[in-house]
Regions:
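His/acidic metal-ligating clusters that form di-metal
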Residues: 1-60, 89, 96-97, 113
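Binuclear metal-dependent phosphoesterase catalytic core
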Residues: 53-116
Length: 116
């Protein structure tokens, strides 16, 4: 199957301010994707990791490496933060797509379990 990569997310954000940066005609894209072999759509631009579906296809929105946007700032505007940067790992398996958001900011260990 195909992995489709677009810069602007083809789905709205939970924040009205961030939704301004979404793809302009997502319904046109959805119409083209129906019945296609696209397994996942990857995007970014918002600097906030997220997930959704478009035409029944999973959409993974990557966070930002340079900075992270504050999704809790909500509809007051846009606030960039120096913490909470991340990237997304995508693994393709027969019949499955798995995504994982990986934080890259400094953090403290709460607990650790060593196996093996």
């Amino acid at each position: 199957g195909t992995v489709l990569v677009v810069h602007h997310p083809p789905v709205p954000s939970a924040s009205a301010v961030m939704s301004r940066f979404a793809l302009r005609n997502p319904d046109d894209l959805a119409e083209v994707l129906v019945g296609s072999d696209v397994r996942i759509i990857l995007s970014g631009h918002l600097h906030v990791p997220g997930s959704a579906t478009l035409a029944g296809i999973p959409v993974a929105i990557a966070g930002g490496l340079s900075y992270a946007a504050d999704p809790m700032y909500q509809n007051r505007g846009y606030r960039a933060m120096t913490e909470a940067q991340s990237f997304t790992v995508v693994e393709l398996y027969p019949g499955q797509v798995v995504t994982m958001v990986v934080p890259v900011s400094a953090h403290s260990t709460l607990y650790q379990i060593d196996v093996g």
